[in-house]
Amino acid sequence: MATNPLSILFVASEVEGLIKSGGLADVAKALPEALVNLQHDARIAIPAYTAIPDVCDDEVILDTHLETWPHTHYQVKKRFLGDNPVYLIACGHYFDRPSMYAENNQAYTDNGERFAFFSAACLDMLPKIGFQPDIVHANDWHTGLVPFLLKHRYGQDPFFAQTKSILSIHNAVFKGVFHYDEMQCLPEFHCRNVPDAAVSSTHMTMLKAGVMNADKINAVSPTYAEELKTELGSHGMAWEFQQRAGDLVGILNGCDYSAWHPDTDSYLPINYKATKQSMVRGKNGCKRALQEQVGLPIKDVAMFGMVCRLTHQKGVHYLLPVLTEFLKLDVQLVLVGTGDPLLAAQLRDVAAQFGEKFVFVEAYNNQLAHLVEAASDFFLMPSEFEPCGLNQIYSMAYGSLPIVRGVGGLKDSVCDYDVNPETATGFVFYEPTAQALLITMQRALLLYAQNLTELRRVQLYAMERDFCWNKAAEQYVELYRSALK
C-alpha cells in the first residue's frame, strides 16, 4: 500500500516558467516536476494573472461561481508545464492587473481578499473537475487559508474525507495580516473570533490559519524548522510553531541543475566539468570574462562574488562596515543587486573609491548572475536569516566556495573548512557581526594565497555535492504519507 502513487495539488501564488518574483516559484516548478519523476500525479494551481504570457489562450475546463462571494464568477484554465498539469484560476476582478502583488512598490489593498478567493476557489474547483487529491500542498501566507478551509468548510464533505493538507513555510516574515473586515467574503470570519487565525481582536493572519490547521507543516530546511520555534526565527509566531512542533519538519530545497550547471550553462563563455583541468580552465576563462564585462583589471586574483537583494536579511549591513578594510587586500569583488537605496548609495561610494577592486552592479541581470557564480573563487552570503537559500548550492555546483552565516539552510548545506577540511564545501561564521564576516573572508583568502592546490581540491569536492530535487521529493513523499496515516 505504501508504494501506491499519490495525487497532489500543489497550490502556490507563482511558478517558474509562467510567472515569478522569488524562490517560491522555483520550488513550485521543481518539486511537482520531481514528484512526477517519482511516478506521482502532481498538479499545480496558481492564479491566472494577466501578466502570464498567453493566459487568454489557455483551455477553459470549468466556468463556475463561488458561493457566498460577491465577485463570484471564475474560470479554471488548464495548460501543462512539462508533464505537470497547471490549473489557472481566472477571475478578472482579482487577477486582471499588471502585477502579482503590488504596483509602484505599493501592495494591492485587497491582497487579503484576492488570495482568500484563490484559496477558496482551489478547493471549490476540485469536485467540479473531478480531481480528488490525497494531498493539497499549500505554500506561505498566500495559500494559508487552504488548510483552514479544508478543515472548517470541507471537513464533513465526503469528497474531501481522505484529503490531507501540507503547508510549506518559505519565509515566515510575511504572514498575510489583514483586518477581519477584509475577510467578510468568508462566512468563517463573520464572527470575528477565530482563535486559530487571530493575531488580535481586529486582525487575522493567513499564515497562522495555515499553521494551526494543516495536517503537517514543513520548513524549507531542517535548521529553519528549529528556528521557527523561536521568537527571533519565527518573527513573532513561536507559540504557534511550538504548538505544532510534532507535525513540523524541515526539508532542504533541491537545486534545478538543468538551469544551474557549469557544464551546460549557456550564459558562460566557457563551460566546464568537475575535473581539475576542466574546472581551472573554465573558471579562469569566466573570471577574465567577468573582469572584462564589469571593467575590472585583468589579473589572476582572488575573486569574491555576491548576488542578492539589498536588504537587511541578506546581510549587506555586515559587509559594509568592513568592506574598505577588506578591499585593501589583494582581492576583487563584484556585487550584483538592487533594493534598499541607502545600502546602494553606500556601495556606490565604496566602488568609486576602490574602482580597481570593487564593482557594484545595481541591477539584476540573469546572465551576470550566472557569470559571477562561475568566475568567483568565493561567494558571499552573510545572511541575517536564510530559510533555505539557493545561491550557496549554485555556488558549490560552480566551484565557488560559499562564505555563509550559519543560519537556516546555509547551516544545513555548507560545511566549514576549519571544522573538517576533508568534507568542507565553504566557510561558515555564526556571530552576527561585521568583524566575524571579515575574519571568515580572510580565512578564505589565506587558503587561496597559501595553498592553491588545496583550494582546487575543495572546489572540486564542492562541485560533486548533489542537491538534486529528486532527493528532496522523496522526503516530501514521506511527509505526505505520514499525513495520510
Curated annotation (Swiss-Prot):
Xref: InterPro entries: Glyco_trans_1, GS/SS, Starch_synth_cat_dom
Ligand binding (ADP-alpha-D-glucose): K20
Enzyme Commission number: 2.4.1.21
Protein keywords: Glycogen biosynthesis, Glycosyltransferase, Transferase
GO MF entries: alpha-1,4-glucan glucosyltransferase (ADP-glucose donor) activity; alpha-1,4-glucan glucosyltransferase (UDP-glucose donor) activity
Highest taxon in the source lineage: Bacteria
Database matches in CDD domains: GT5_Glycogen_synthase_DULL1-like (cd03791)
BP-aspect Gene Ontology terms: glycogen biosynthetic process
Catalytic activities: [(1->4)-alpha-D-glucosyl](n) + ADP-alpha-D-glucose = [(1->4)-alpha-D-glucosyl](n+1) + ADP + H(+)
Pfam families per UniProt: Glyco_transf_5, Glycos_transf_1
Its biological purpose: Synthesizes alpha-1,4-glucan chains using ADP-glucose.
Family listed: Belongs to the glycosyltransferase 1 family. Bacterial/plant glycogen synthase subfamily.
Protein's name according to its UniProt entry: Glycogen synthase
Species of provenance: Vibrio vulnificus (strain CMCP6)
Underlying gene: glgA
